[in-house]
Amino acid sequence: MHFAGIVAIALATGATAYDLPENLKQIYEKHKSGKCSKELQGGYDNGHSHDGKSFSYCGDIPNAIYLHSSKNGGQYADMDIDCDGANRHAGKCSNDHSGQGETRWKDEVQKLGIDDLDANIHPYVVFGNENDDGDDPEFDPRKHGMEPLSVMAVVCNKKLFYGIWGDTNGHTATGEASLSMAELCFPEEDPSGDSGHEPNDVLYIGFTGKEAVPGKSADWKADSTESFEESIKELGDKLVAGLKA
């Protein structure tokens, strides 16, 4: 990508990149190294062959769930691209050959006035794993207090972004988010349906409790990622402020 293109993307997304508050900086550094002491479910990979099935859902942060691996001295997750939902072949999702026609919480989304989440607009995180064939470890975040379509915090590129829990994974893959979330996090990498962010340095934080659900206060009909993220920022800030390092 030409430098001018990178600058244009950065300017377009910069308004929604939030600085890390001090407690989140401490959380990121503290929980990255070492092992997860409160493993909720392990046996997952990052969708690639390296690092094996070393990833787990961890409950070491009170009132939150996050992904972690003890490999390489401790690491978080990568960001593969999900294009499921509405307009799944639109824009830079056009080269995604693994997308599905709907997201996990489509029925709930329709109650909020839209047909389904749009990976090109809604910055959602793929979190939790369905037991597709009976042999894979299942993890349902709802059993640990998370609610569908609740706000999630994503620490990437040394910045904070807000998204929602919008989909689940099959089998053992973890570390996935919608195209629009990847564009917020890594505009300089020009993500697409077939190209994500490989380093395991992304911290996905899901919040437990019904208070993490924005409901109708979120701008589900937003025509841009920035507008949607701004509509959940106040709630996201409140949830992040409550995290203890």
Curated annotation (Swiss-Prot):
Alphabetized InterPro entries for the sequence: Chitosanase_fungal
Predominant location category: secreted
Top-rank taxon, per record: Eukaryota
Gene Ontology molecular-function annotations: chitosanase activity
Pfam families: Glyco_hydro_75
Keywords assigned by UniProt, alphabetized: Carbohydrate metabolism, Glycosidase, Hydrolase, Polysaccharide degradation, Secreted, Signal
GO cellular component: extracellular region
Localization, UniProt: Secreted
Recorded catalytic activity of this chain's protein: Endohydrolysis of beta-(1->4)-linkages between D-glucosamine residues in a partly acetylated chitosan
GO terms for biological process, alphabetical: polysaccharide catabolic process
Signal peptide: 1-17
Keyword hit for Disulfide bond: no
Record bears the keyword Cell membrane: no
Top-level EC class as recorded in UniProt: hydrolase
EC number: 3.2.1.132
Role according to the record: Chitosanase catalyzing the endo-type cleavage of chitosan, the deacylated form of chitin. Chitosanase may be crucial in the degradation of the deacetylated portion of chitin in the fungal cell wall. Chitoolisaccharides produced by the hydrolysis of partially N-acetylated chitosan are known to have many biological activities, including antibacterial activity, immune-enhancing effects, and elicitor activity.
Family: Belongs to the glycosyl hydrolase 75 family.
Name of the protein in its database record: Endo-chitosanase
Species whose genome carries this gene: Aspergillus oryzae (strain ATCC 42149 / RIB 40) (Yellow koji mold)
Classification lineage: Eukaryota, Fungi, Dikarya, Ascomycota, Pezizomycotina
